[in-house]
UniProtKB/Swiss-Prot annotation:
InterPro entries with a match to the protein in the record: NADH_UbQ_OxRdtase-like_20kDa, NADH_UQ_OxRdtase_20Kd_su
PANTHER family documented for this protein: NADH DEHYDROGENASE, NADH DEHYDROGENASE [UBIQUINONE] IRON-SULFUR PROTEIN 7, MITOCHONDRIAL
Gene from which this protein is expressed: nuoB
Annotated family: Belongs to the complex I 20 kDa subunit family.
Organism: Tolumonas auensis (strain DSM 9187 / NBRC 110442 / TA 4)
Keyword check for DNA-binding: no
Record-listed E.C. numbers: 7.1.1.-
Binding site for [4Fe-4S] cluster: 66-67, 132, 161
Name of this chain's protein: NADH-quinone oxidoreductase subunit B
Source domain of life: Bacteria
Enzyme class, spelled out: translocase
Pfam family, one: Oxidored_q6
PROSITE patterns, alphabetized: COMPLEX1_20K
Lineage of origin: Bacteria, Pseudomonadati, Pseudomonadota, Gammaproteobacteria, Aeromonadales
Length: 223
């Protein structure tokens, strides 16, 4: 599996945010020239740490626009987001693991979103929820940033206007799957300080043949 290695770029211009550089590499555990024992031990240690991270994701209680309503609906008893270990909503970004950009990222709001993202402690992740956060949506105007990934690194995109709560739950599952494949430093003092993220396949491409093969559409009373 191919991985994307992300490191801080000390030579990045001040105008660029975030100041990081990326490159495509192979699985770091396969490239390590160590003995079988140490290699297996590091693999087990990485898997254990990733298992704990992905099953205890604390979201930051933050919303910009109407998609936030659908996000909060996922925390009700009907959908029960506690099944995925993400029911502990935090009021401070310093206590959260990830933030969901749910709504329209206005230019005036972009510096605030950046500051909140910087206050998240590592490891941290970002979910872009809805067409407005993904690409500006129908607001192709001067006051809206055309995609939150213009100033934040996004891990999972949720399409829709607005997406249903089930789409948010699927995004959580995709984020958990991505976290399970990550290779992060086991210490801030020892070893490579880069972050290796697995290049996950696009969900649209995975189910393309299945969608094309559909010939019998359900009637409105069965939807």
């Amino acid at each position: 599996m191919k991985y994307t290695l992300t490191r801080i770029d000390p030579n990045a211009p001040i105008e660029r945010y975030p100041a990081e550089k990326k490159q495509t590499v192979n699985d770091p555990l396969q490239e390590v020239g160590r003995g079988i024992l140490l290699g297996k031990l590091e693999n087990v240690l990485n898997s254990t740490v990733n298992w704990g991270r992905k099953n205890s994701l604390w979201p930051y209680n933050f919303g910009i626009s109407c998609c936030y309503v659908e996000m909060t609906t996922a925390f009700t008893a009907v959908h029960d987001v506690a099944r995925f270990g993400a029911e502990v909503i935090r009021a401070s970004p310093r206590q959260a693991d990830f933030m969901v950009i749910a709504g329209t990222p206005f230019i005036k709001m972009a510096p605030v979103i950046q500051r909140l993202y910087e206050q998240l402690l590592e490891p941290k992740w970002v979910i872009s929820m809805g067409a407005c956060a993904n690409s500006g949506g129908m607001y192709d105007i001067y006051s809206v940033v055309q995609g939150v990934d213009k100033f934040l690194p996004v891990d999972v995109y949720i399409p829709g206007c607005p997406p249903r709560p089930e789409a948010f739950l699927q995004a959580l599952l995709l984020l958990q799957k991505s976290i399970g494949e990550e290779r992060r430093p086991l210490s801030w003092v020892v070893g490579d300080q880069g972050v290796y993220r697995a290049q996950m396949p696009c969900e649209k491409d995975l189910f393309r043949e299945e969608r094309i093969a559909v010939t019998n559409l359900p009637t409105p009373d069965k939807l």
